[in-house]
């Protein structure tokens, strides 16, 4: 799949990022991951991101990363395109990018580098180096320490033909509007704030109709139904979903830092697809919080 074909796929539909399965000892659980992918693939997501942020990329060893990406690519070979999360320091990100390409990933989600303070010129050089290390399409994730400006993105677009997507995890509306107006159709634009459904209608109005859904991991039917309501501008249905599910969900998610990942794993377990515990430094939901989530999920009906 060439980068422009990937861009076309990412320009419509719902995206998601499967959690990574661990066993009771915290090691990668391949059979559970295959079962998860086989469950989720038929629901109709346009693409899935393996080893992304919700897939705990930041906690994976290099050997595990290779097994996870290969498992995802092989399992979904005939059903849904797999993009691989990559990140870390530049040389590390390049190694991950080239490994994902070798294993057959259709594209990459370039996650922010971890912790290190850097100028945005330096971040742009990092993005350029990763893009030039592979031939497959790359989506850059503006979030946390990665805050690329319209000018820098325009320069990167000129230098890196395979940079085909921009994912926004900042929520800076002025910046998003500036990027969307400046770059036009050069990129596919993805909403990437945690629990992106809450912002989906607003982002669609800005020209960003596509987003990635975390809750697709455990209420896939609801996630797809909500996306279709957004796509057809059914504001009444959207409002009902937000009132009945997403706002109560946020009340649980916002209890602790890191719960944006932990609550998804808890939901997957309740749904019958236990992915095991999160890895430190993340912490799992408490039993009471799991009960609250289970009650909320039960109200949504069969998935």
UniProtKB/Swiss-Prot annotation:
One of its GO terms (biological process) is D-glucarate catabolic process. It comes from the Bacteria. SUPFAM superfamilies: Aldolase (SSF51569). Keywords: Lyase. PANTHER family: 5-DEHYDRO-4-DEOXYGLUCARATE DEHYDRATASE 2-RELATED (PTHR12128:SF19), DIHYDRODIPICOLINATE SYNTHASE (PTHR12128). InterPro entries: Aldolase_TIM, DapA-like, Dehydro-deoxyglucarate_dehyd. The keyword Lyase applies. Its EC number is 4.2.1.41. Belongs to the DapA family. It comes from Pseudomonas syringae pv. tomato (strain ATCC BAA-871 / DC3000). It is an enzyme of class 4 (lyase). It catalyses: 5-dehydro-4-deoxy-D-glucarate + H(+) = 2,5-dioxopentanoate + CO2 + H2O. This is Probable 5-dehydro-4-deoxyglucarate dehydratase. GO terms for molecular function: 4-hydroxy-tetrahydrodipicolinate synthase activity; 5-dehydro-4-deoxyglucarate dehydratase activity. Transmembrane segments: none annotated.
């Amino acid at each position: 799949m060439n980068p422009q074909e990937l861009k076309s796929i990412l320009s419509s539909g719902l995206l998601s990022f499967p959690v990574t399965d661990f066993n009771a000892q915290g090691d990668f659980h391949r059979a559970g991951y295959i079962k998860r992918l086989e469950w989720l693939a038929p629901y109709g997501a346009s693409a899935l991101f393996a080893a992304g942020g919700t897939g705990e990329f930041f906690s994976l060893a290099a050997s595990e990363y290779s097994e996870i990406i290969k498992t995802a690519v092989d399992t979904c070979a005939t059903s849904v395109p797999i993009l691989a999360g990559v990140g870390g320091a530049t040389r590390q990100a390049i190694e991950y990018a080239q490994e994902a390409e070798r294993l057959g990933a259709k594209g990459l989600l370039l996650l922010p580098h971890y912790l290190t303070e850097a100028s945005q010129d330096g971040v742009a050089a990092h993005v350029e180096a990763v893009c030039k290390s592979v031939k497959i399409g790359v989506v850059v994730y503006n979030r946390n320490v990665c805050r690329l400006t319209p000018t820098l993105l325009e320069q990167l677009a000129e230098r890196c033909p395979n940079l085909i997507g921009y994912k926004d995890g900042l929520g800076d509306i002025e910046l998003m509007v500036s990027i969307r107006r400046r770059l036009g159709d050069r990129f596919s634009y993805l909403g990437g704030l945690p629990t992106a459904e809450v912002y989906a209608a607003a982002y669609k109005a800005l020209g960003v109709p596509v987003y990635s859904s975390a809750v697709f991991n455990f209420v896939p039917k609801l996630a797809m139904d909500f996306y279709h309501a957004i796509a057809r501008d059914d504001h009444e249905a959207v409002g009902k979903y937000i009132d009945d599910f997403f706002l109560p969900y946020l009340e649980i998610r916002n209890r602790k830092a890191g719960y944006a990942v932990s609550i998804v794993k808890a939901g997957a377990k309740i749904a019958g697809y236990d992915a095991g515990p999160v890895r430190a430094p993340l912490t799992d939901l408490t039993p009471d919080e799991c009960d609250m989530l289970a009650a909320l999920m039960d109200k949504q009906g069969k998935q």
